[in-house]
Amino acid sequence: AADYVITGCGTGEGAMLALNSFPGVICGHVEDPVDAYTFAHVNDGNAVALPFAKGFGWGGELNLEYIFEKLFGFGHGQGYPKERVVPEQRNKKILDGVRAVAFRDLSDILKDLDRDLVKGAFAGEHFAEYFFPACKDEKLAATVRELMA
């Protein structure tokens, strides 16, 4: 239900690992604008994890501004350097194929997790308001409704 996720933690590593545990998510670790630009163009993922305890002191707002500029200002999947676009896009498709085989369906995963943990994740004040209208997967929506009951 989200097109792109921006998250983080102290080092960014834990948040990245957590997001990469889910099917359909390719999360990169972004510390600076170069990381943002190369992740967007080489890896073409859909999530980034930032290290909020590193490099975000004095001038940190500039670092964030430049990260978002490089992450979203020039498109995605265009290769870096540009002449590497074809092999990089080919490798991205290979990775997507591996991940499609390696990960289980999210509905099945949610059903096998601790029910209290899942219910807590869905308990946010506006979760249902935002999730259900944006959810494009009816099976997933039905699973979430079932688990929220």
Language model regions located:
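A short, small-residue-rich loop immediately preceding and capping a beta-strand
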Residues: 2-8, 27
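Gly/Ser/Thr-rich loops at beta-strand to alpha-helix junctions
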Residues: 9-14, 55-56
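Short secondary-structure boundary segments
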Residues: 9, 31-32, 51-52
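Glycine-rich beta-alpha loop segments
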Residues: 1, 149
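C-terminal binding/interaction regions
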Residues: 37-148
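Short Gly/Thr/Asp-enriched flexible loops that form oxyanion-binding sites at enzyme active sites
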Residues: 14-27, 31-32
